[in-house]
Amino acid sequence: MLSARPRLDPIVVTTPPLPRAFVLGNFVQACCWHVARLPQAGETLEAHHLQIEPGGKGLNVAVCLQRLGVAVDTLIGCGDDAAGDALLALLAREGLATTHVHRLTGPSGWGAGLIGADGSNCIAVHPGANRLLTAAHAEAARGAIEAARLVYGQFETALVAVEAAFAIAQARGVPTLLNPSPWQAPPEALRAATHTVIVNEVEAVDLLALPQPLDGTPQGAARAVAAALAGFHAHWPAARRLVVTLGEHGALGAEFDDERWSMWHAPARAINAVDTLGAGDGFSSGYALAVLQGDALPMALAWGNLCGAHVAARTGVIDALPDAQGLAAMIEQAPPAAARQLTFE
């Protein structure tokens, strides 16, 4: 039987300065077509709006954390093209350092997205210069990695750079946060250097080798994830947290401590979802912010949900990423629902 115990700890906005974060970024020039609904295979639909903006999972997280008051260093590869020029202009506007931004020969990354009226989306990405980063680029950023209090990585950049940066972080005792998206099976060395894994409900099926998709309810998802935690721990020996985002159903978080797992569920904020593209990056940013503030897992899930909701309630991604004032306004309107600890009896 699944039961829940409420936690009513308040969520508060702290003021900067906060500790430093190192983000393994990536950059794609994103082109998004807004359509009434997503097309079927072989079908052509007319889009009613075209949106072009800089994007990328790592770039989104770097920008969001910077806006929230975190001191961010980021490793990004971009091409020697107009898109690369646009990236440098964006970083300058956001106040992000470009010490570890590398202009490489060839095109920048490009992405194409279709966004339905209900907020659903499908995305394709050409990595371009993102795949040209190497372990040497991560080594050149060693000082920034070792000075960070959290290192974030994702799979839209070169895997060898992520692996090298996580190894540096682990050797220094810096917690690592991995969003293995787009999903691919991570190498053993990367699994052995990852403290926290964040995936969505689709990626969780691959990550945990589940026999079927999660059933779409927090209770069913929690049972499936809980049953797979022993296998996850064996495959990811350094991992102490696993977070699974459930869209409109919030997020699950599991934590390994004192040789046992505990699990929490944080309900999603009720919003009118306009565009869910980038909501997961918003969640990762809010979660990372909470970790940097020293918050426990239940509060980190609440922060993640709050930032994700801010993005999903707006069109676009970069412009929809919150700052501290934006989050404070949301909290003033309606405090987030308390996370609940789940037990299986």
Descriptions of predicted regions:
Residues L2-F22, Q184-A185, L210, D215-E345:
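Conserved phosphate-binding/catalytic region of the ribokinase-like
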Residues M1-L75, A82-A89, R93, A270-V274, ...:
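Glycine-rich phosphate/adenosyl-contacting loop at the front of the ribokinase-like
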Residues A82-E94, G113-I115, G119, I123, ...:
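Active-site-proximal loop->helix
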Residues G77, R103, G113-F155:
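Conserved phosphate-binding/catalytic loop of the ribokinase/pfkB sugar-kinase fold
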Residues S3-P6, R131-A136, T176-P182:
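Short gly/ser/thr-rich secondary-structure transition/capping motifs
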Residues L90-T105:
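A glycine-rich helix N-cap at a beta->alpha junction
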Residues L150-A227, H249-A251:
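Conserved beta-alpha-beta core of the PfkB/ribokinase-like small-molecule kinase fold
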